[in-house]
């Protein structure tokens, strides 16, 4: 018995070193459950007596069939992980002599007796890494009694792959006399094609006894349940630690205290699985720090994969910057604006449960819009449920709306990806049915250029806002051009005004490219020196080139536009008594009297006065008639006497002509 125990310890130590080379730490309780599961699903495996990749894949196929038939509840959570671990050991046994020796030794044990009674009790707790139990529980119980072991310890069960040599084989040598180098050479013969094949007869089958042991050790259900609980608690602790480390790493990289997607940053994000992929799924707990900071009602569902290939679903926090941007867009541009719908579609790419959608809409939209969206969403879910019923699909109205038996978040997290897609389609369709409220263009008219803001930046903000409202800036280019002039600062308006109807928006930008802070500062100083505002100074700047007003003498306007003419124009002076004639109230230069009020003649005006029309003289002075008086003259028809010769005289010239 001492030799058997020493041989077993040496084999366990060898297997421990083989696993250590792979960097894997195996637990006793997990491996024990795995061996029990292999025994239940594959009772033929220990009877064949050969361990190769082909037979081990048959074991994996049995696992998959068992999983498809009974579901994930009947399969241990570590079954597939340990199967992959042992598969890697079998694949690497040709390059690792230590693994090759362990596999060869196990094959010898299986060939010698498939129902060997072995005990595994290690005095050193550090060596208690892998369960190596026997299929014969009755023989095992007797061996335990012979060794004087305590009956309170749980009896061991059947080893699947890695077993120690039996103590009942009379041909087993002493472990101290075993040539381990020779054993490695013998194990290498199994896979060397140049050597002759190593043929052995298969172990005889005992038809009188069944393949599985008839007498099983009594297992306490409470103890087994406690082991499962302890295993789950340890899994939860490791997952929490994993999430906390990823969150801390993200904070160190970005310097931001709020970590939106730690799984993505840590490289653990996974593409969503489509229906039909048989992967065990569960829910892992999030970090306690996140639970205190962010409520659980507004998280999308994400799925991550741990190091063992298991998928876990949990809630991951929204990026609150996206939610804030969505609320701002819905308030400024409207719930159905193209920019707002683009944000909604980006958020809808996640797996959102009906509770998540309801919470998101209630936080972003007003109370009335939330009720409108909810009514449209329920109507869309009814139509989708009818189509699912006609197609034979079990996704009903309660699952789509998250009501009834599916009102809890835990139940909604386990939805299939196809169901999440139907919920997304119904929610986004209901969002598009929301009515347009207010004037969307009001936010566009509120975009004004700052005093020191470059005109190009102002136009960019204007075009961006127009694109969010109209869907494309080209749709409202004329409206944008008008607002680019009206909402510009006075300096840019003065530069654009002469060319306003001669160029387009790009011309506006080119005209205002030189207007910057220094130009604005000089313009303000010039306006202050002239005693005018900047706007008045720019309006009067081009008018000063026309000269001064002829009436008031000031610059900036003409005489016809002079506002001071009406104030300075006094009433006309009334003439008094005429100084020449003393008989009327009129100006002296307008007096036409010949005599004054005493009857004395008034001398004529000296100098050039107002002249009338010239008149012909009534009498010819100094003229001599040379026509003789002749009665036969045909031109003389007037019966008047002929004129006499007149003398020359001197008279003053007429005063007027």
From Swiss-Prot:
Residue ranges of the propeptide: 101-161
Motif PPXY motif mapped to chain: 202-205
Residue ranges, compositional bias (Polar residues): 113-125, 140-152
Example GO molecular function: nucleic acid binding
InterPro entries linked to this entry: B_retro_matrix, B_retro_matrix_sf, Gag_p24_C, Primate_lentivir_Gag_pol-like, Retrov_capsid_C, Retrov_capsid_N, Retrovr_matrix, Znf_CCHC
Annotated zinc fingers (CCHC-type), start-end: 547-564, 576-593
Site residues (Cleavage), renumbered to this chain: 100-101, 162-163, 216-217, 299-300, 525-526, 621-622
A Pfam family hit: Gag_p24
Swiss-Prot/TrEMBL GO biological process terms: viral budding via host ESCRT complex; viral translational frameshifting
Motif PTAP/PSAP motif: where in chain: 210-213
Segments crossing the lipid bilayer: none
Record lipid sites (N-myristoyl glycine): 2
Key words of the record: Capsid protein, Coiled coil, Host-virus interaction, Lipoprotein, Metal-binding, Myristate, Phosphoprotein, Repeat, Viral budding, Viral budding via the host ESCRT complexes, Viral matrix protein, Viral nucleoprotein, Viral release from host cell, Virion, Zinc, Zinc-finger
Cellular component annotations (GO), alphabetically ordered: host cell cytoplasm; viral nucleocapsid
Region spans: Disordered: 113-178, 592-657
Domain of life of the source: Viruses
Segments forming a coiled coil: 216-257
PANTHER family: ENDOGENOUS RETROVIRUS GROUP K MEMBER 24 GAG POLYPROTEIN-RELATED, IGE-BINDING PROTEIN
Name of the protein: Gag polyprotein
Species of provenance: Mason-Pfizer monkey virus
Taxonomic path: Viruses, Riboviria, Pararnavirae, Artverviricota, Revtraviricetes
């Amino acid at each position: 018995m001492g030799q058997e125990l020493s041989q077993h310890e040496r084999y366990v130590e060898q297997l421990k070193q083989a696993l250590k080379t792979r960097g894997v730490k195996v637990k006793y309780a997990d491996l024990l459950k795995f061996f029990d599961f292999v025994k239940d699903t594959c009772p033929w495996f220990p009877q064949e007596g050969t361990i190769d990749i082909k037979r081990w894949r048959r074991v994996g196929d049995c696992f998959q069939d068992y999983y498809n038939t009974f579901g994930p509840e009947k399969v241990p959570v570590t079954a597939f992980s340990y199967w992959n671990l042992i598969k890697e050991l079998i694949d690497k046994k040709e390059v690792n002599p230590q693994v090759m020796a362990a596999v060869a030794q196990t094959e010898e044990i299986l060939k010698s007796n498939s129902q060997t009674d072995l005990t595994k009790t290690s005095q050193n707790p550090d060596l208690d890494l892998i369960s190596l139990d026997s299929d014969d529980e009755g023989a095992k119980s007797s061996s335990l009694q012979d060794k004087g072991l305590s009956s309170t310890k749980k009896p061991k069960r059947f080893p699947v792959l890695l077993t120690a040599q039996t103590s009942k084989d009379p041909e087993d040598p002493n472990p101290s006399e075993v040539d381990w180098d020779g054993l490695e050479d013998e194990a290498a013969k199994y896979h060397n094609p140049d050597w002759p094949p190593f043929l052995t007869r298969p172990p005889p089958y005992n038809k009188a006894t069944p393949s599985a042991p008839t007498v099983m050790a009594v297992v306490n259900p409470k103890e087994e349940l406690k082991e499962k609980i302890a295993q789950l608690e340890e899994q939860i602790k490791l997952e929490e630690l994993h999430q906390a480390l990823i969150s801390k790493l993200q904070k160190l990289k970005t310097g931001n205290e709020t970590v939106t997607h730690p799984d993505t940053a840590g490289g653990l994000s996974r593409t969503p699985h489509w229906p039909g992929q048989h992967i065990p799924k569960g829910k892992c707990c999030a970090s306690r720090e996140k639970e205190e900071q962010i409520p659980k009602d507004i998280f999308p569902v994400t799925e991550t994969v741990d190091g063992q290939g298991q998928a876990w679903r949990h809630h991951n926090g929204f990026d609150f910057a996206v939610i804030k941007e969505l609320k701002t867009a819905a308030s400024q541009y409207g719930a159905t604006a193209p920019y707002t719908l683009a944000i909604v579609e980006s958020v809808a790419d996640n797996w959102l449960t009906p509770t998540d959608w309801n919470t998101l809409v209630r936080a972003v939209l007003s109370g009335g819009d939330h009720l409108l969206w909810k009514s449209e969403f329920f109507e869309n879910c009814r139509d989708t449920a009818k189509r699912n019923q006609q197609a034979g699909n079990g996704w009903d109205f309660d699952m789509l709306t998250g009501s009834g038996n599916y009102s809890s978040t835990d139940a909604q997290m386990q939805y299939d990806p196809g169901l999440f897609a139907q919920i997304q389609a119904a929610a986004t369709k209901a969002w598009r049915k929301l009515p347009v409220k207010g004037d969307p263009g009001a936010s566009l008219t509120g975009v004004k250029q700052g005093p020191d803001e470059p005109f190009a930046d102002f136009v960019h903000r204007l075009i961006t806002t127009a694109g969010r409202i109209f869907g494309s800036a080209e749709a409202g280019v004329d409206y944008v051009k008008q607002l680019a002039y009206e909402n510009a600062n006075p300096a840019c308006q003065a530069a654009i005004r002469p060319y306003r109807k001669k160029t387009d928006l790009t011309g506006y930008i080119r005209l205002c490219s030189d207007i910057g802070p220094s130009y604005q500062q000089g313009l303000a100083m010039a306006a202050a020196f002239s005693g005018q505002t900047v706007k008045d100074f720019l309006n009067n700047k081009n008018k000063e080139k026309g000269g001064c007003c002829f009436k008031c003498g000031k610059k900036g306007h003409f005489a016809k536009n002079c506002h001071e003419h009406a104030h300075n124009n006094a009433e006309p002076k009334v003439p008094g008594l005429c100084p020449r004639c003393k008989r009327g109230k009129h100006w002296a230069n307008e007096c036409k009297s010949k005599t004054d009020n005493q009857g004395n003649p008034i001398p004529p005006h000296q100098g050039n006065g107002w002249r009338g029309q010239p008149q012909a003289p009534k009498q010819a002075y100094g003229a001599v008639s040379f026509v003789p008086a002749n009665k036969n003259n045909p031109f003389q028809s007037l019966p008047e006497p002929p004129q006499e010769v007149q003398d020359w005289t001197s008279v003053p010239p007429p005063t007027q002509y």
